[in-house]
């Protein structure tokens, strides 16, 4: 069964995402990061389809709002997105059909032992309004 095409979502990389971990990817992978970022942008435009086909993980959903984890691989690395340990946290406003890239990070950068607790702390510190929506 083919699903009807839905209009694309608008998206933006939040300044915190740009300044922090994404900057690390840009330095480490140079041109491959540009291609990877373009791929992430394309996924954001079709995030509803990615969720439908389990290509992104829904973490929280409250009303029109969703918090989603997206695994990604850096272009040219030949590692699957899941195995790469690279993730983006996305905030989705379904009413406006808009996606915000909140954080792009490597598990190695955010580190063990509790990755979830660490990204929740970042959300609470940098995105207080979003943290309130999801009671983080």
Locations of regions flagged by a protein language model:
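Active-site beta-strand-loop-beta-strand hairpin of nuclease catalytic cores
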Residues: 92-101
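Basic, Lys/Arg-enriched alpha-helical interface segments
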Residues: 1-82, 95-96, 106-136
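Short, surface-exposed coil-to-beta transition loops
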Residues: 82-88
């Amino acid at each position: 069964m083919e699903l009807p095409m839905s209009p694309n979502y608008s998206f933006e990389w939040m300044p915190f995402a740009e300044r922090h971990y994404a900057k690390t990817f840009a330095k480490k992978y140079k041109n491959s990061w540009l291609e990877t970022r373009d791929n992430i942008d394309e996924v954001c435009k079709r995030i509803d389809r990615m969720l439908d086909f389990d290509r992104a993980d829904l973490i929280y959903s409250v009303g029109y709002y969703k918090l989603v984890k997206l695994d990604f691989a850096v272009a040219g690395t030949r590692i699957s997105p899941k195995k790469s340990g690279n993730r983006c946290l996305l905030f989705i406003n379904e009413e406006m059909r808009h996606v915000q890239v909140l954080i792009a990070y490597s598990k190695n950068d955010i580190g063990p032992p509790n990755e979830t607790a660490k990204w929740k702390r970042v959300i609470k510190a940098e995105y207080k309004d979003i943290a309130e929506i999801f009671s983080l």
